[in-house]
Each structure stands twice: as C-alpha cells, then as structure tokens.
Amino acid sequence: MKTLQFFFLFCCWKAICCNSCELTNITIAIEKEECRFCISINTTWCAGHCYTRDLVYKDPARPNIQKTCTFKELVYETVRVPGCAHHADSLYTYPVATQCHCGKCDSDSTDCTVRGLGPSYCSFGEMKE
C-alpha cells in the first residue's frame, strides 16, 4: 500500500513540477502558390506541457504570462517541391526546432491562437506523395 501511495505522490509531483516540453517529430504540409498542390515533409517541433496558472484576481502590476511549450532555437531548411512548372520557384524554406523550453509565446514568429489551422492543412486540397 505504501508503494502505491508513493507512486501516486511521485506522479503528482512529476505532473506539477516537471515540464515535459521537448522536441517531437511531426509531418507538415508545405505548399507553393505556383505549384497548386501540397507535399508532406517530416520535421521537428516542440510539444508537451508547461506548468502555468491563471490567477483569479488580476493584478495590473504583475502581468499574468501563460507559459507554453515553444522553440528556444530554430534552424531553417530548404526543400525543392517536385513537379512544379519549370518557370515556378520550387524552393520552400521551413523552420526546424532544435531546442525547446517553456516560455511566453512570441506572436511575431508563432501562431499563438488557441486553435490554428494545424500542420497538415493544405489550401489546395491536393496532396502529392
């Protein structure tokens, strides 16, 4: 019984005190206006949860910053979209996260909305393999 209680307390401590914001492999749809279709590529991005809280009483002197799992460092990779017209620019550059942390969402470089379009959204409706 004590082992079960210890395990339960350990799980609660892990959920509250330890962030699990880490790199994860994802598949995203990339599209070029000139090519009129999308392709899927594999990349890494940040996923997980971060300890945060929403205060009941708002204090204007202390801003309430919600922490989210976001990138700390990025690199950019470029891929050639196959099957584009010869006159079209078929190069596409996309971000690859190399390090993650729990921090404030930077709306200048990230979609901080509650529910974005998602990584597999394709505005053309046609995916090529």
Curated annotation (Swiss-Prot):
It comes from the Eukaryota. Residues 1-20 form the signal peptide. GO terms for molecular function: follicle-stimulating hormone activity. Keywords: Disulfide bond, Glycoprotein, Hormone, Secreted, Signal. GO terms for biological process: follicle-stimulating hormone signaling pathway; G protein-coupled receptor signaling pathway; positive regulation of bone resorption; positive regulation of gene expression; positive regulation of steroid biosynthetic process; regulation of osteoclast differentiation; regulation of signaling receptor activity; Sertoli cell proliferation. One of its GO terms (cellular component) is follicle-stimulating hormone complex. It is found in: Secreted. Glycans are attached at N25, N42. Disulfide bonds join C21-C69, C35-C84, C38-C122, C46-C100, C50-C102, C105-C112. SMART domains: GHB. The keyword Glycoprotein applies. Together with the alpha chain CGA constitutes follitropin, the follicle-stimulating hormone, and provides its biological specificity to the hormone heterodimer. Binds FSHR, a G protein-coupled receptor, on target cells to activate downstream signaling pathways. Follitropin is involved in follicle development and spermatogenesis in reproductive organs. PANTHER family: FOLLITROPIN SUBUNIT BETA (PTHR11515:SF17), GLYCOPROTEIN HORMONE BETA CHAIN (PTHR11515). Belongs to the glycoprotein hormones subunit beta family. Heterodimer. The active follitropin is a heterodimer composed of an alpha chain/CGA shared with other hormones and a unique beta chain/FSHB shown here. This is Follitropin subunit beta. It comes from Pan troglodytes (Chimpanzee). The lineage of its organism: Eukaryota, Metazoa, Chordata, Craniata, Vertebrata.
